[in-house]
Amino acid sequence: MNRIMIVDLVNDLRNKNLEAEEYIERTYEKIGKYDKYINAFITIRSKEEVLKEVKESINKGGKLAGVLIAIKDNISTEGIRTTCASKMLEDYIPPYDATVIEKLKKEGAVIIGKTNMDEFAMGSTTETSYFGPTRNPWDLERTPGGSSGGSGAALAAGYVELALGSDTGGSIRAPAAYNAIFGLKPSYGTVSRFGLVAYANSLEQIGPMARNAEDLGLLFSIIAGPDERDATTINLNLNFELKERSVKNVRIGVLSDILEMSEKPVSGVIKDVVNKLSSEGALIEDTKLGNAEYALPAYYIIAMSEASSNLARYDGVRYGYSKYMEGNWREVYAKNRGEAFGMEVKRRILLGSFILSAGYYEEFYLKALKVRNLIKKNLDELFKKYDILLSPTMPILPPKIGEVINDPVRMYAMDLNTVIANLAAIPALSMPVGFYSDLPIGLQLMGKYLSDIYLINISSFIERNITKLYNLTASVKI
């Protein structure tokens, strides 16, 4: 366990306490040794090109000068392949950078590569990728969570200190929990989605992933902020400042209805953390979300409906996979899409189209929107009583590769604890709090809208004073 932070790394590179060549050589050596087993990256940039950019960045300066960062492969990067882990976009190279990438480059970050993910971010285990599954560095027989599993695994393996993911229903927080790292699903509208390949617009956010709370906050403050190219962003200054917050008198509601639905090894670790928070002076109460059992079906109805609409643009003609160009447009459309989309993506498109069809729109979609509003109202009431809501991030330990991929209902149920924050547009953070049989367990902290930085500071207190778990690197057993 190492206390070095990004600010220390930037200073070491600038002062030549760490030479750029050594930094790059060490990183690529580790990737070369382990990633044939982990499969965290879809695309890795050449060592020479990255070293050149790192040196230039160190000379220019910036909050992230010379720091390598891994980017989830559904975020547009100019000149770097962006596949969404799909055959449909296997060779797509964007002509522009996403807003978050522009902001990172401005502060000197250097992209090392694009990370593996569930195809079009549809999945909870990073097994639906066209490029093969990503494996968990803590146990190569198990999944790293999804859909941002490649970013989580790259951090856990120690390839990089920072990564970006996207979170539609838990896709940052699940890999954070399963890889013993920190991940934040920001408040909706705090981070621009311009350049994010859309899955479900009303639910998803780009967010930071890091190996400790301080770095998480720094990365969030860099990517957050308004963007005229994304009308959903809000005009708000979210500069992060690490504050040694105590949890004394912090009102914490433990979501007992969610906690009790978790596996015993998971709930046991979480209850131990809750007891320690209480001994530090936190005001702990058991509470219930109310209507929690409806959150998951409402989420999937909304997400699949938006997915079927968003993915209609991949017609096999304008861009993307276009092997079949003869016959009428229906044949071209069906053949190209049928061959280029994976099974899980097809399933969600079909279900979404069904939900939005005549006769079912009111029965399913409109009712799901009503449930969404009900959950928002329930949370508004809870946040009048509590500063933070606490639960396990994931209800189960990391499943083995192949264990849930062919059981969609079981895979969807993995998102039980995380979809709530997406439905309500509130921030939610996952942090490592313990292990069971050497498998990481994550704690989820949810706060009221725009309390992102408050959550990060609370997580910093917990990591420093209670769990002492930060900057963890898995000992990869190959």
From Swiss-Prot:
SUPFAM superfamilies: Amidase signature (AS) enzymes. It catalyses: L-glutamyl-tRNA(Gln) + L-glutamine + ATP + H2O = L-glutaminyl-tRNA(Gln) + L-glutamate + ADP + phosphate + H(+). Keywords: ATP-binding, Ligase, Nucleotide-binding, Protein biosynthesis. Its EC number is 6.3.5.7. GO terms for biological process: translation. The active site is at 72 (charge relay system), 147 (charge relay system), 171 (acyl-ester intermediate). One of its GO terms (cellular component) is glutamyl-tRNA(Gln) amidotransferase complex. One of its GO terms (molecular function) is ATP binding. It comes from the Archaea. InterPro entries: Amidase, Amidase_CS, Amidase_dom, AS_sf, GatA. Belongs to the amidase family. GatA subfamily. Heterotrimer of A, B and C subunits. Allows the formation of correctly charged Gln-tRNA(Gln) through the transamidation of misacylated Glu-tRNA(Gln) in organisms which lack glutaminyl-tRNA synthetase. The reaction takes place in the presence of glutamine and ATP through an activated gamma-phospho-Glu-tRNA(Gln). This is Glutamyl-tRNA(Gln) amidotransferase subunit A. The lineage of its organism: Archaea, Thermoproteota, Thermoprotei, Sulfolobales, Sulfolobaceae. The gene is gatA-2.
